[in-house]
Curated annotation (Swiss-Prot):
The active site is at residue 9. Disulfide bonds: none annotated. It comes from Escherichia coli (strain K12). Belongs to the site-specific recombinase resolvase family. Residues 1-134 form the Resolvase/invertase-type recombinase catalytic domain. This protein catalyzes the inversion of an 1800-bp E.coli DNA fragment, the P region, which can exist in either orientation. The function of the inversion is not yet clear. Keywords: DNA integration, DNA invertase, DNA recombination, DNA-binding, Hydrolase, Ligase. This is Serine recombinase PinE.
Length: 184
């Protein structure tokens, strides 16, 4: 059975173009979402995935209607393949029921993995460069060294940690980490 999926990013957008293309392709059922593709909560897609069974073909108008990213799309199509479900994208001329379509998706999977590895590589290189220039990653410290010293003096003088935490707007656990209980 051919089962279609349409998605638009906002409620005021229209799915007619996608629906017409899927109807012309012979889809018997069409599921719909009116939500951004970056959102992981897509009720129409979830319902569609529960409905699909071995031998079915999931049909979309265009690849970007289904996946949030290339990596997400490749993972999703691989999960479908494991369940015996084919995938077809009308405008991209992809059909995983054919050897060429399956090959194309293997290539896409390799490209998605390479993209992920390149991002990791660039991130590491950027962090190394920043460290070499004396910059430290992460957020700025909540307190200056002088404020930490003052907080330590207050605790040493017997001020309850809860009160010091309120004064410096830090958690009590943060104070215990910085000034363990036995270190008064």
């Amino acid at each position: 059975m051919l089962i279609g999926y349409v998605r638009v990013s906002t409620n005021d957008q229209n799915t007619d173009l996608q629906r017409n293309a899927l109807n012309c392709a012979g889809c018997e059922l069409i599921f719909e979402d009116k939500i951004s593709g970056t959102k992981s909560e897509r009720p129409g897609l979830k319902k569609l995935l529960r409905t699909l069974s071995a031998g079915d073909t999931l049909v979309v108008w265009k690849l970007d209607r289904l996946g949030r990213s290339m990596r997400h799309l490749v993972v999703l199509v691989e999960e479908l393949r494991e369940r015996g479900i084919n995938f077809r994208s009308l405008t991209d001329s992809i059909d995983t029921s054919t050897p060429m379509g399956r090959f194309f998706f293997h290539v896409m999977g390799a490209l998605a993995e390479m993209e992920r590895e390149l991002i990791v590589e660039r991130t590491k290189a950027g962090l190394e460069t920043a460290r070499a220039q004396g910059r430290i990653g992460g957020r700025r410290p909540k307190l200056t060294p002088e404020q930490w010293a003052q907080a330590g003096r207050l605790i040493a003088a017997g001020t309850p940690r809860q009160k010091v935490a309120i004064i410096y707007d830090v958690g009590v656990s943060t104070l215990y980490k910085r000034f363990p209980a036995g270190d008064k």
